[in-house]
Amino acid sequence: MKKSYRVKREKDFQAIFDGGKSTANRKFVIHFLEKEQDHYRVGISVGKRIGNAVTRNAVKRKIRHVIMEFSDHLKRDDFVVIARKGVENLDYQEVKQNLQHVLKLANLLEEGFESEKKH
């Protein structure tokens, strides 16, 4: 994921938290701020309650991969994905399903988007 697609600075995170809206499911919270820009920007937060650094980084990699997979269908807003306790035990498909669910709740995925389901 290119740097221009990331929310990195504290003031950007704070603007999203203060001026935006949020929605959640059991595994993720998404804070988002509607903004007119060329592309979406995403910040990922995985707290120390999730596990050690290796575990947290593995969770972040899964989230990043799912976001990149959905990238063509995401609205051009800023958003922050916060992982909740229990996400460290999910496999990639479960992370994908949960993220897709919460992105739809936040109305950040384009209308009519359905990812292919692998069984």
UniProtKB/Swiss-Prot annotation:
InterPro entries: Ribosomal_Su5_D2-typ_SF, Ribsml_uS5_D2-typ_fold_subgr, RNase_P, RNase_P_CS. It comes from the Bacteria. The keyword Metal-binding does not apply. It is an enzyme of class 3 (hydrolase). One of its GO terms (molecular function) is tRNA binding. Its EC number is 3.1.26.5. The keyword Nuclease applies. One of its GO terms (cellular component) is ribonuclease P complex. Keywords: Endonuclease, Hydrolase, Nuclease, RNA-binding, tRNA processing. Disulfide bonds: none annotated. One of its GO terms (biological process) is tRNA 5'-leader removal. It catalyses: Endonucleolytic cleavage of RNA, removing 5'-extranucleotides from tRNA precursor. Pfam families: Ribonuclease_P. Gene3D superfamilies: 3.30.230.10. RNaseP catalyzes the removal of the 5'-leader sequence from pre-tRNA to produce the mature 5'-terminus. It can also cleave other RNA substrates such as 4.5S RNA. The protein component plays an auxiliary but essential role in vivo by binding to the 5'-leader sequence and broadening the substrate specificity of the ribozyme. Belongs to the RnpA family. Consists of a catalytic RNA component (M1 or rnpB) and a protein subunit. NCBIfam families: rnpA. This is Ribonuclease P protein component. It comes from Streptococcus uberis (strain ATCC BAA-854 / 0140J). The lineage of its organism: Bacteria, Bacillati, Bacillota, Bacilli, Lactobacillales.
